[in-house]
Structures are given as structure tokens and as C-alpha cells.
Curated annotation (Swiss-Prot):
Residues 47-60 are annotated as: Basic motif. Residues 61-98 are annotated as: Helix-loop-helix motif. GO terms for cellular component: cytoplasm; nucleus; RNA polymerase II transcription regulator complex. It comes from Caenorhabditis elegans. It comes from the Eukaryota. The keyword DNA-binding applies. This is Protein mxl-3.
Length: 235
């Protein structure tokens, strides 16, 4: 655009100079004719005419060069023979196309900027709030492991609790049961007690002060203390 403006400025300036030159030439010729027609020197007219022709040639070359540059810059004129009027027409069309593209690209950039801002806000919200799922996973794992440990022990401990609540019935059962069955029942109860103590070892290790494989005396049920076991075996 600046080259076109410069060409228009040079064209207007050259036209002004040509008008001034014509006025001066006309005034000089009229003065020479009125005063003395023979006194005008032909060398001065030739110099002025040569100077004017040089200026006009420079102006035309300048305009021609810039039209060539404009033609090369417009992709719509590739391989097409064009006049100056066609070059200017294609240049105007190309300018309109580029303005449309620039406006659409500007809107796309604004949309992308808005989306990036929304994503940054969501990331900040997630970082500030934290992920609740990750904090719940260890608690769920611990509770499930505790349930797996305690579920096999619960039925056996219920049987022990029932025997401890009714010591007379426990003595009758011990007297009427065979020694082999009684030993198996005692071993089953001991295994249940050891499993229970193993589950509590991480909480209070002081419960397992006795020798390994032998449950402490305080955890025997009333019907199956060490004395009752010996009496039952003797019977």
C-alpha cells in the first residue's frame, strides 16, 4: 500500500511540474514573440525539453517497477498477462480476502484464549480441592483387610462366648465327650484365640508376651482353663 501511495504522489508531482513547465514555456514564448522573436535562443528550449523528458522517463520507470512488484506479490496473477488496471483490480480483491482471513483468525485466537483460561481455572480448582478418590483408597484397603481377618474368627469366638456364659453345661459336655473329640475342640478354640491375637498384634504387641504357639492364660474360657483340660483328659 505504501508503494502505491508513493507512486501516486510521484505521479501528481510530475504532473504539477509538467503544468508549471508548460506555463513557463508559454509565457517565455509569448514574451519573446512580443519583444523580439529573433532574440530567443534555441539551446534553452532544448535543455528544458530534455529535462522534462528525463523527469517523465524516471516517473514512468518508477511506476512500472512498482507495478511489477505488486504483480509478483499477488498470487491471483500467477502466469496471467495483465495490464495495470487488472493488477490494481486483483490487488483490491486480494486485500479484501486477506482482511477476511485476518478477522476470522482473530476470532479463533480469542476463542482459544478463552478456552485456555477456562482450563487453567479448572486445574487450579482441582489442585486446591484435591482428589478425594486417592485419599479414600487406603482407608478402604485397610477396612477390607480387617474384615477379612475378623470374619473367620467371629463364629469361633461366638462358640467360645456361649461356652463361657454357661459353665455348667460346658462341664457336662466335657464329661460326656470323648477325649479325642475334646482335644480337637480345645485345639480349635486355641487356634481361634491365636488368630484373634495375631489380628490384634499390630495394635497392642504386649498381648503376646507368652511363648509362641501357646495362648496366654487370661484368654481361656471359663470351661476350658488348663485345670479343666487336664480333668477332662483324665476322665
Amino acid at each position: 500500500m505504501s508503494a502505491i501511495v508513493e507512486d501516486m504522489y510521484l505521479l501528481s508531482s510530475s504532473m504539477k511540474m509538467e503544468k508549471q513547465f508548460r506555463k513557463r514555456h508559454h509565457s517565455d514564448s509569448s514574451d519573446d514573440d512580443s519583444s523580439s522573436p529573433k532574440s530567443a535562443s534555441p539551446s534553452m528550449d532544448d535543455d528544458r525539453r530534455a529535462h522534462h523528458n528525463e523527469l517523465e522517463r524516471r516517473r514512468r520507470d518508477h511506476i512500472k517497477d512498482h507495478f511489477t512488484i505488486l504483480k509478483d506479490a499477488i498470487p491471483l496473477l500467477d502466469g496471467e498477462k495483465s495490464s495495470r488496471a487488472l493488477i490494481l483490480k486483483r490487488a483490491v480483491e486480494f486485500i479484501h480476502v486477506m482482511q477476511t482471513k485476518l478477522s476470522s483468525q482473530g476470532k479463533a485466537i480469542e476463542d482459544l484464549t478463552r478456552k485456555n483460561e477456562l482450563l487453567e481455572e479448572r486445574l487450579l480448582e482441582r489442585e486446591s480441592s484435591g482428589s478425594p478418590s486417592s485419599s479414600r483408597l487406603p482407608a478402604l484397603a485397610v477396612s477390607s483387610s480387617q474384615m477379612q481377618l475378623t470374619m473367620p474368627i467371629i463364629p469361633q469366638m461366638q462358640n467360645i462366648a456361649q461356652l463361657s456364659q454357661y459353665p455348667q453345661q460346658a462341664n457336662i459336655i466335657a464329661q460326656s465327650t470323648n477325649p479325642a473329640q475334646l482335644d480337637g475342640l480345645i485345639a480349635l478354640n486355641n487356634d481361634a484365640i491365636l488368630a484373634l491375637l495375631g489380628s490384634f498384634q499390630s495394635v497392642s504387641p504386649s498381648l503376646l508376651d507368652s511363648a509362641p504357639g501357646t495362648p496366654p492364660s487370661g484368654f481361656y474360657p471359663c470351661a476350658f482353663s488348663p485345670v479343666d483340660q487336664q480333668m477332662a483328659v483324665k476322665i
